[in-house]
Regions:
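Hydrophobic/aromatic-rich alpha-helical bundle segments in the mid-to-C-terminal region
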Residues: 165-172, 191-200
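Basic/polar phosphate-binding segments, predominantly the helix-turn-helix DNA-binding elements
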Residues: 183-190, 209-260, 267, 271, ...
Length: 310
């Protein structure tokens, strides 16, 4: 979730939205419209992160100025300038700045039906291969390989078309994205991309259930035991699952989730800091401020002031 963003918005480009997720961590933000289900984002990053989430849409991220860290399931990617990643539908992922300094990213989130509905040849030939069981979770894109270079160029062209909105830009963006899906589909046939094993898929689905439990109970006292019990795991197995998939402990995730909820309330309400902390599961006001500062690099009061000053 972006904090104190400096958004390079123009034309059809948006500032990245705050991640609003349902109980399984699935993002609920609508990207684009029902008629044209794509949205493109630009972000000049100072202190930037996108919490763990997933959505039905495909997503591409391009590092205009790196480095950026993109976590996809159990894999951590560092995107250098000029590199990109295409993330498949339904895959857990998160984004953060890799090093101190500024990073600029361009990203796009689009629903598969932008290319064609399920009853079209476009779905059967271009989309279905990517949605099959065992399909790659993501494709790392680098200009050093011919097909990846073409894919990156098409993604940037699609992004720019949505940004500038020239005549017939919808068709241009759709054409470029269809080309990308053709390239990715060919890689699926050749065994390319980073695939997810059945065991990893089971672990990811179990993680979604645990994220849902945190979403539903974050205002209550939460322990590793309670989180583990929601999927019939032992505490040690729960800890191992979080560390392997998210790189953090369950309680660290709970803290991050509570802070993001608190940040949302600081932006959208006039509740006092203490009230917000209590609503988000922090029983001690001083601990809330300390935890918020650790994760957001400012106090809740400063966060609200900076948001209001934008």
């Amino acid at each position: 979730m972006a904090f104190q963003t400096s958004c390079a918005a123009a034309g059809g480009i948006n500032c990245p939205p705050d991640i609003v997720a349902d109980g399984e961590g699935r993002e609920l933000v609508q990207h684009g419209s029902a008629l044209f289900p794509i949205a493109c984002y630009a972000e000049d990053v100072k202190s930037y992160s996108v919490a763990w989430h997933w959505h039905e849409e495909f997503e591409f991220i391009f590092a205009v100025k790196g480095p950026l860290t993109v976590d996809v399931n159990k894999t951590q990617l560092v995107l250098r300038t000029g590199q990109g990643v295409f993330i498949n539908s339904g895959v857990l992922h998160a984004v953060e700045q890799a090093e101190s300094g500024n990073a600029l990213l361009h990203s796009g989130v689009f629903h598969p039906r932008l290319v064609g509905g399920m009853d079209t040849i476009f779905w059967q030939k271009r989309i279905r291969p990517l949605l099959q069981p065992g399909a790659p979770a993501f494709f790392l894109l680098d200009s050093g390989t011919a097909w990846q270079r073409e894919a990156l160029a098409c993604l940037q062209d699609a992004w720019q078309a949505v940004a500038d909105e020239p005549p017939d830009y919808e068709n241009e963006a759709r054409y470029r994205l269809t080309t990308v899906l053709r390239l990715l589909g060919a890689q699926c046939e050749e065994g390319g991309g980073v695939k997810v094993s059945q065991q990893e898929q089971i672990a990811a689905e179990r993680m979604k259930q645990m994220l849902r439990f945190v979403e539903e109970h974050y205002a209550e006292e939460l322990t590793v035991e309670r989180i583990a019990a929601c999927v019939a795991l032992s505490e040690s197995a729960c800890l191992r699952s979080f560390r392997q998939l998210l790189g953090i402990t369950p309680i660290q995730y709970v803290k991050q989730f509570r802070v993001e909820k608190a940040a949302e309330l600081l932006r959208s309400t006039r509740l006092r800091t203490g009230e917000i902390g209590a609503e988000c599961g922090f029983t001690d006001g001083s601990y809330f401020i300390k935890t918020f500062r650790e994760l957001k690099h400012c106090t809740p009061k400063e966060y609200r002031q900076r948001f209001e000053a934008q």
